[in-house]
Amino acid sequence: MQFSEGVIDNGRFGTRTIRFETGRLARQAQGSVVAYLDGETMLLSSTSVGKQPKEDCDFFPLTVDVEERSYAAGKIPGSYFRREGRPSTEAILACRLIDRPLRPSFNAGLRNEVQVIVTVLSIAPGEFYEALAINAASASTLVSGLPFSGPIGGVRLALIDGQWVAFPRYEDLSGAVFDLTVAGRVFVNESGKEDIAIMMVEAEATEPAWDLIHSHGAKKPNEEVIEEGIESAKVFIRTLCDIQRDLASKLSLSHTEPDLYPDYSDSVHSFVEGLVKSDLEKVYRGNHDSGYAPNALSASDEIKQKAYDAFHDAVLSGRFDQDSLSQFPHAYKAVLKDVVRTCVLEGFARMDGRGLSDIRPLDAEVQVVPRVHGSAVFQRGETQVLGVTTLNMLKMEQQIDSLAPIVSKRYIHHYNFPPYSTGEVGRVGSPKRREIGHGFLAERALVPVLPSREDFPYAIRQVSEALGSNGSTSMGSVCASTLSLLNAGVPLRAPVAGIAMGLISGRVDGEMRYVTLTDISGSEDALGDMDFKVAGTSDFITALQLDTKLDGIPAHVLSEALAHARSARLAILDVLTRVIDSPDQMSEYAPRVVRVKIPVQKIGELIGPKGKVINSIQDETGAEISIEDDGTVYIGSSQADSSEKAVAMVNSIVNPVEPCVGSQFLGTVVKNMPFGSFISLVPGKDGLLHISEIRKMVDGRHLESVDEVLSVGQKVLVEVSKIDDRGKLCLVAVK
């Protein structure tokens, strides 16, 4: 067994120890590493590779899985079979965090299946394992001998009291303004020195950020602060990469060199380039003075079809073999990519004719779906998102059964991406990893501006339906959700908007140029060097996601991208606030929730034996009631009078009014006797309505039985006429 370890120094916040071991567990896998965080959090990562290339596969078949084991936290699964089932949302999000920096680090053309499995064997209370998992996956891949440009270091940072703290615990986040996860690797720059290439960033303002900023004077997570955080991460990433390299240096690695299958041959590329390059340059260079010109895209489709016909003829004539037909789409895309990038770098227009900082036409509308609690449509160019808000009692908040320290959340954001959004036919069913990731990004963008539980005691479910997609439906979801939440009457602390930025880099006349693009389309995302999504208020950033294909983004380029993103965000916020600038009245179909505080010792009395009391209140009023451990009672109903009636009944139980002579009550008949009826005035207080008084209710006529006038369960207005020495109550009917 070999091991390597290092220390992450957080100054006054203490240290964290990272340790990697190999050669003890999972020895059959091509690469396996056990990663430790402070000795108690333990992950096993294995990297395996298929012996043969996957047939009919034109992409790199990499699979990343995270297996959460309940025993890691000393739990038995709560499912019927007491066994782990499908991955939790948190595990899926961890898979995406690992996959995003790992995938581009393999050699292009690799077609052997590669599977990385990270198993959580042990986790200390209050710890997060995602950042450690990035390092574990990188280390197991590094020692597997596969062609890999790692190692990759991943670190989670929290901005606490102005300091970026690495690998924070859950309790640390209560004082944090921003939560940042960064992955990167060491590379040799043009000057021959080692530097850190940032590959992936995932970030969010925390739930308490608003209060920390506005009530405690904490630093706002604006563009400058985010840049500082990313720079701070580089120090920790270098340390993590050094630990992995030290481990690999202690091993006698047998490097595996699977065959590489390039997407196209040089001869196919040259032939296709000769067919289409000049025509594509005419189309895209011609967009320079044409403004927004989506017709350029259809023109390029015509060029592609003509070129395919010509290439097909060349195959039939024997110039290329039949298998070369599958290379045509990749070769065409490579030529198109080169033309489009060159046009942008040389100062010509983008693919659709826009300027570098232009946003596509915007449109927004609220209250578009009847009966729902809130709804809105947001459109940016061809990207269209429907947002729908549903409100309910807090007892409907999501309970999280995973290894994450977070056990529940009251704001739930779901994102759907049906195949018709891109004009295609496809599978419809449970959400894919991409949909889960997009929904979580939009959720994190909005959580910092949601009202507190005390100010707005509702569980909130937000659904984003991507109705049309051509670039950044996730940021469209943020905008649609802001509108929908306000339409539902949710008092957001501030509106939030999002925008996707892109980057194209390359040499022009020997000089390296970087050009940032605002509001990238789907094609620009595929052909560019960066996908950079930024969401926030007019004041600060609430969520950020960055993926890049470059070996590092210069600081001034990142700063420029953040500045352009802010300008675009403010422009979109202006459109949103023109549509709706304050919360609407809540829908008549939404529940009205009232909060009542009762003494903790009265909780059992309110619930009653086997829930008898609380169930009777719910049955009688139609309201829903939930009770918190601290004595907070939430009462909700879509009808205001039902809530008021339930509140009165709760108060009558926990804060009963002592009956006195002359006080009136709307009582309930609980028992009939030959001499009269017993009426319940308040819980535990009954009085007797004598038969002589009951006769007065029917003008004094003779009664064989009181059942002729009153029945059990009937409501009757009575007044206390006398209280005898034993405390017995005598009642009279009030007409």
Curated annotation (Swiss-Prot):
Its EC number is 2.7.7.8. Mg(2+) binds at residues 525, 531. Gene3D superfamilies: GHMP Kinase, N-terminal domain, K Homology domain, type 1, Nucleic acid-binding proteins. The keyword Cytoplasm applies. It is found in: Cytoplasm. Its main location: cytoplasm. It catalyses: RNA(n+1) + phosphate = RNA(n) + a ribonucleoside 5'-diphosphate. SUPFAM superfamilies: Eukaryotic type KH-domain (KH-domain type I) (SSF54791), Polynucleotide phosphorylase/guanosine pentaphosphate synthase (PNPase/GPSI), domain 3 (SSF46915), Ribonuclease PH domain 2-like (SSF55666), Ribosomal protein S5 domain 2-like (SSF54211). Its cofactor is Mg(2+). SMART domains: KH (SM00322), S1 (SM00316). Residues 591-650 form the KH domain. Keywords: Cytoplasm, Magnesium, Metal-binding, Nucleotidyltransferase, RNA-binding, Transferase. GO terms for biological process: mRNA catabolic process; RNA processing. GO terms for cellular component: cytosol. The keyword Transferase applies. Involved in mRNA degradation. Catalyzes the phosphorolysis of single-stranded polyribonucleotides processively in the 3'- to 5'-direction. Belongs to the polyribonucleotide nucleotidyltransferase family. This is Polyribonucleotide nucleotidyltransferase.
